[in-house]
Structure formats: structure tokens, C-alpha cells
Regions:
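Membrane-interface helix termini and inter-helical loops of multi-pass transporters
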Residues: 75-83, 131-144, 232-241
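Transmembrane helix exit motif
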Residues: 1-9, 101-109, 118-140, 253-270
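Alpha-helical multi-pass membrane helix bundles of inner-membrane/thylakoid proteins
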Residues: 10-15, 133-156, 266-274
Length: 274
């Protein structure tokens, strides 16, 4: 935070200030709900031209570090999770980011997005069927054991690896937790904790090289903290049934978004060739 203030840019307009703080609040509020903050923030910065393209990656990673850490800490204190499940999924997630990431970066991103998008839409449909009593999914467990714990750990490994190529882990983690019979609230400390670990590691190179917009990063952090506090209170106050519907909506939203991203890249490439 000291670095953001000390090296802040001069000549920032009131419009830019408004964008920085509004984006910080709104993006982090919805990040807590599992929708994610990086993609909408990147799009807003590009649309409003308030942050140079080469500074956007560093601004996003540095700006969201403190809010994501706060999310993780708040959910860890407010949501009960069995320690074996938490440590197992955290550990496999860290290993997945370090080892699995090397494999994931060699795979075609388009194919990964399509696979994940179709998977999320299919899972969303199954979860919706369970809400109407057509499928035996969901539950209220706060921990996993046996084969279910193994599946969860393998899933955390894979999702953390995919995170290194820009495929978010929030929605898939929520879906995995739901389908393994756990309380949907348990997904929040798990996915936020893994996100915090990844963001902390990723922010150091940008901070050291000073490749980020200081005003935008500070505003994203300051307003983001407020957004996180409000959203965490709302999420932890929601009844189980509402949380289950939230997971279903996030699954459909993220699945459609991933498919659009996959085919949008292809259409852009064809247009450039034409």
C-alpha cells in the first residue's frame, strides 16, 4: 500500500478516480459470490481506457491481493470446514499450481475452455435437477472422507493447474463441493484460500518491477475491502437453499462465459486473417 501511494501517477481525472473505486467495489463484491473479479475489471479498464494495456495485468494482481486474502480469512473464521478436507485440498492445490501448471501451459487453451464450459453447463443442469428431486446431489457435510476426499484433492490439483492458464477455479470448485455432498458454503474458504495463495505469489514480480497503475491498484484494494466485507456478511447469512441456487447460477454463468471466450478468440483470428 505504501508503494502504491508513494509512486502514484499525476494528473488523474475525477472520471478515472470514479472508475477505479467503483470497479474495485463492484468487482470484489461479486468476486465473493464466486463470479470472479479479474475478467470484468479487465474489460472495464479497456472499455474506459483508464489503465494502459501493459499495466492492466500487474494492476489486477496487486490490487486484488489484499481483498482476496481478506476473503479467505473471513470465510475461514465464519464457515466450518473439517481440517483434513481443508489441508488436503489446499495442499493439492499448491502442488497443482507448481507442478500441474507446467503441463497445463502446454495444452490448447481453447480446448480447455470448451471442456470446462460444457462441464459447468452439464453440472448446472444436474444440480438444477437435484433441486427438483430428480437427482440425489447436494448435502450439508462440512468435510469429506475416503474416495470423496481423494476426488476433491485431485480436483483441487487440476483446477489449480488450470488457473495458471487463466481458467478460473471459483465456479468449478463450487460445483465440485456441491456434487460431493458438502454444504455449498464450504466452497468459499477453499476457493478463496487457493486464490489468495496464487495471487500473493503472482503479485511480487509486478510489484518489484513497478509495472502496475498505482492509483488504480490502490483504489481497487481500498474499495474492494469494503465490497468484500459487505458480500461476506451477505453470503454467510444466506440459507442453504439460496446458496445452492447461487452455485447453480454461477455454474451456468461461468460455463456460458467460457464458451463465449473460447469461440470469440477463434472469430477474432478469422477476422484478422480475412
Amino acid at each position: 500500500v505504501h508503494g502504491m501511494i508513494k509512486h502514484r501517477e499525476k494528473g488523474v481525472t475525477p472520471f478515472q478516480y470514479a472508475v477505479y473505486y467503483l470497479v474495485g467495489f463492484i468487482a470484489n463484491f461479486f468476486d465473493v459470490l464466486g463470479i470472479g473479479s479479474l475478467a470484468p475489471t479487465l474489460a472495464t479498464y479497456k472499455l474506459t481506457k483508464t489503465v494502459d494495456d501493459d499495466l492492466i495485468p500487474g494492476t489486477l494482481v496487486i490490487g486484488c491481493a489484499i481483498p482476496v486474502i481478506l476473503e479467505a480469512l473471513l470465510f475461514l473464521t465464519k464457515v466450518e470446514v473439517e481440517i483434513l478436507t481443508l489441508v488436503g485440498m489446499y495442499g493439492c492445490g499448491i502442488i497443482g499450481a507448481l507442478i500441474g501448471g507446467k503441463v497445463a501451459t502446454k495444452l490448447p487453451v481453447k480446448a480447455l475452455r470448451i471442456t470446462m464450459g460444457v462441464g459447468l453447463l452439464s453440472a448446472g443442469a444436474l444440480m438444477m435437477m437435484s433441486k427438483f428431486g430428480l437427482m440425489p446431489l447436494g448435502g450439508n457435510a462440512i468435510g469429506l472422507h475416503g474416495i470423496k476426499l481423494v476426488i476433491a484433492c485431485i480436483g483441487s490439483f487440476i483446477l489449480a493447474a488450470l488457473l495458471t492458464v487463466g481458467i478460473g477455479n471459483y465456479a468449478p470448485t463450487m460445483v465440485m463441493v456441491y456434487m460431493l455432498g458438502m454444504n455449498p458454503a464450504v466452497a468459499f474458504p477453499i476457493m478463496m484460500g487457493l486464490g489468495a495463495l496464487g495471487v500473493c505469489n503472482g503479485s511480487f514480480p509486478y510489484f518489484a518491477s513497478n509495472r502496475y497503475h498505482h492509483h488504480a491498484a490502490f483504489a481497487f484494494t481500498a474499495a474492494g475491502v469494503v465490497g468484500v466485507l459487505i458480500a461476506v456478511y451477505l453470503v454467510t447469512s444466506l440459507p442453504l437453499s439460496v446458496l445452492q441456487w447461487l452455485v447453480i447460477l454461477v455454474a451456468f454463468y461461468t460455463g456460458i462465459t467460457m464458451l463465449k471466450q473460447a469461440f470469440a478468440r477463434e472469430n477474432v483470428a478469422k477476422a484478422n486473417v480475412g
